[in-house]
Regions:
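Internal transmembrane alpha-helix with an interfacial aromatic "cap," most often the third helix
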Residues: 16-26, 52-59, 76-124, 147-154
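Short helix-loop boundary/capping segments
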Residues: 112-169
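Hydrophobic transmembrane alpha-helical segments in integral membrane proteins
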Residues: 1-17
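Helix-loop junctions on the outward
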Residues: 46-74
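C-terminal transmembrane-bundle signature of multipass membrane proteins
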Residues: 12-20, 146-251
């Protein structure tokens, strides 16, 4: 129990600073022509903060606080908007700042991933969650490939700070793919094979609104702490940095 409360307190403290910096980048963005990226970052950061303050698990419906705001329906709805904002920010940043020409199909791919996520959340059949993670992994792999090509052939045309951020982006995406292939996707596949209880879309919809299983048991949260921590910290910082470096698109 104490491990979960300690994790929650630490991560909540970090979110206060994340919100501060996201708002600051949004205010600074008004001086340049890159408000869109800053809006995406602020939305993504705000939703991650909300999900930190009221942590919950979509499929199992486990949450820390027994409040209507902890409903999976609310949390998953906000997460959907945030993740779409994140992929749109990635598309904008790569095309305008890193000069990595990405297809807009990556956004459509994440729309599909969000459908998989909702199907997994409502039916609790984790083959859908597995499909979501595979879609995200394939999308990020495509962006990584394009970033590497840019780093090899176009880096000399970039400002030094942008070039360094490109290298950071490559590292970030590489580590993400490793984590997905080694940890997340196998976990969801294992859950799919061991969990035989599923629900109809209608029953799952009602459960997502009203059913909450309150727990601060570390065993219930151990795996989720492993992915929530980098999701609500590193990914948020990356989004805020994209908003900051978006000013290079007007140079």
């Amino acid at each position: 129990m104490y491990q979960v409360w300690g994790w929650w307190a630490m991560l909540s403290f970090v979110q206060i600073f994340n919100l501060k910096y996201a708002v600051r980048e949004y205010m600074k963005a008004q001086k340049f022509n890159h408000l869109t990226s800053a809006r995406y970052a602020l939305l993504y950061t705000s939703v991650c903060a909300f999900r930190t303050f009221l942590p919950r698990q979509d499929v199992s419906k486990i949450c820390v606080f027994n409040t209507p705001l902890s409903s999976v329906f609310i949390g998953r709805s906000l997460a959907t908007w945030a993740e779409i904002a994140f992929i749109k920010q990635l598309y904008l940043f790569n095309n305008s700042v890193l000069k990595t020409r990405l297809s807009y199909n990556i956004v459509y791919a994440i729309y599909i991933a969000e459908v998989f996520s909702w199907l997994g959340t409502l039916t609790e059949n984790q083959i859908f969650n597995t499909s979501e993670e595979i879609t995200w992994t394939a999308t990020i792999f495509y962006i990584l490939y394009k970033n590497v090509v840019t780093a090899i052939f176009s880096k000399k045309y970039m400002p030094q700070k942008v070039r360094k951020f490109l290298y950071l982006s490559i590292l970030f995406k590489f580590l993400y793919i490793i984590a997905m292939v080694k940890i997340d996707i196998p976990n969801y596949l294992n859950n799919w094979q061991t969990n035989t209880t599923t629900f109809s879309l209608q029953d799952g919809f009602y459960r997502s609104i009203s059913y909450r299983n309150v727990s601060t048991n570390y065993e219930d949260w151990k795996i989720h702490i492993g992915w929530m921590t980098p999701y609500f910290t590193i990914a948020v910082w990356y989004s805020i940095l994209m908003a900051r470096y978006q000013s290079y698109s007007v140079l």
